[in-house]
Amino acid sequence: MKKYIFMRVLRSLVSIFLVTTLTYTIIYTLVPRKLIFKQDPNYNKIATTADKRDNYENTVFERMGYIEYYDTKELQEKASSMDSSVTVEANATNKAIYEKYINQLGHGWTLGEFTESGQFYATREIPIFERVFHFYANLIDIDHTNKIQDPENPDLKRYLRFENDPAIGWSLVGSGTKHKYLLYFNSQFPFVHQNFVNLNLGDSYPTYANTPVLQVITQGQGQTKTAQVQFPTGKKTSSVNIYSRTYKSPSQADSREVASYGKDDPYTATESNYQYPSMIVSSAITGLIGLVLAYALAVPLGSAMARFKNTWIDSLSTGALTFLLALPTIALVYIVRLIGSSIALPDSFPILGAGDWRSYVLPAVILGLLGAPGTAIWIRRYMIDLQSQDFVRFARAKGLSEKEISNKHIFKNAMVPLVSGIPAAIIGVIGGATLTETVFAFPGMGKMLIDSVKASNNSMVVGLVFIFTCISIFSRLLGDIWMTIIDPRIKLTEKGGK
């Protein structure tokens, strides 16, 4: 079994690599890069002249990993190492120096001129294979005591130690690390939290500009929520998430931060607490409710269809389930939405918001109706197949009733293959339901994927595809392992378990 799991994990990693790499390559080579400025609110404000526009575009392209870029000042500083007489002025002498410097650089660097001022800049197009390499090279972000290198704070202490922190109690506290708290405990699930290892999926742009992708989908939503927060210097009413403290150069700290954290503590950068759940949690809420509804409908219905096969119950149920399976998802979504709105349920999430349970009802019902038909038909199939098995004949010979045989013997064995899909279904709810969330304007990960595609938020699209792929692939492995726990007769081996 160990060898089987090892090989499955290895194949899973290869699959994740192939899917993510293909997605990354398609997005960063086939999608016109200037589309990213369509929903950038700062673009028209900053790019008031041709020079400012070109500089802003190149700066963003560099941040997004398309190019390397030296603006006029940077180029002059770089070229001065070769010829100290070079200036930023637009003249033939400087141009000749810059051209010579660019030729020395090689590797695809080109010299450009701003339209209005005529001043010079340099760019290098980063090849797609190099971009992909950088994505994977920076994917795993490990925090350590030499993470922060701040020239303005050369005497920064460097350590890792357990201490009774005045703000959060016992925790593993770091200095010289990016995060203040590397390991801590609180009442929020999963109760034990760490900041040693984090995923770096890039920064979001243009929506949620310059915010890490993982932070966008895991932080709360809505307005900030204030509460009594225990700071190192005492309790204050604030929206600060005290557990999120990261390093900030002391020269950049304002008086409020110094008053809250103390003069000698440089870990003053924090995230905020919000009123409503994050995208992951929001998708999980409706997904789990929908999953429970799906199994609550499918299990008794499928069992009844198998027990009373070839009767009117079986025929009627089969017809209804076939209709639901044939009905386009978009049609089912709008039918349920119409019915729900007629009984005073909100047909759009923002109407009542995350604070009202009614906002979750229709999306959860739709997910339940989408999942129930297929599950019910599989239960019927498995149970009918088992009705002709020897152990069923033996049970009948012992005089057991059909109800006892169905409930105690057939049903139990029929659940084994279905159990393998439960971990995938449970974990899969994190990914959300793209169509349902979009129609209801539901703030989950499914809707975020569609919104990111529309906004050409390439980093977010790649990040979500990576997360969805990991969830999909590893949940299948968990399903196989769970099946062996339910039925010890099943063995996972390389020979028979591929």
Swiss-Prot record:
User: Source organism's superkingdom?
Assistant: Bacteria
Record keywords: Protease included? no
InterPro entries, per database record? MetI-like, MetI-like_sf
Q: Which UniProt keywords apply?
A: Cell membrane, Membrane, Peptide transport, Protein transport, Transmembrane, Transmembrane helix, Transport
> What Gene3D superfamilies does the annotation carry?
MetI-like
* Pfam families for the chain: BPD_transp_1 (PF00528)
Tell me where in or outside the cell this protein is found: Cell membrane
The yes or no answer to whether the keyword Kinase is present is no
- How does the record classify its membrane topology? Multi-pass membrane protein
Q: Which residues form the ABC transmembrane type-1 domain?
A: 280-479
Membrane-spanning parts: 12-32, 279-299, 316-336, 359-379, 415-435, 461-481
Tell me the GO BP annotations in alphabetical order: peptide transport; protein transport; transmembrane transport
One term under GO cellular component: plasma membrane
Q: What is its main location?
A: membrane
Q: Which family does it belong to?
A: Belongs to the binding-protein-dependent transport system permease family. OppBC subfamily.
Give the protein's biological function.
Answer: Part of the binding-protein-dependent transport system for oligopeptides; probably responsible for the translocation of the substrate across the membrane.
Q: Which PANTHER family match?
A: INNER MEMBRANE ABC TRANSPORTER, OLIGOPEPTIDE TRANSPORT SYSTEM PERMEASE PROTEIN APPB
Q: What is this protein called?
A: Oligopeptide transport system permease protein AmiC
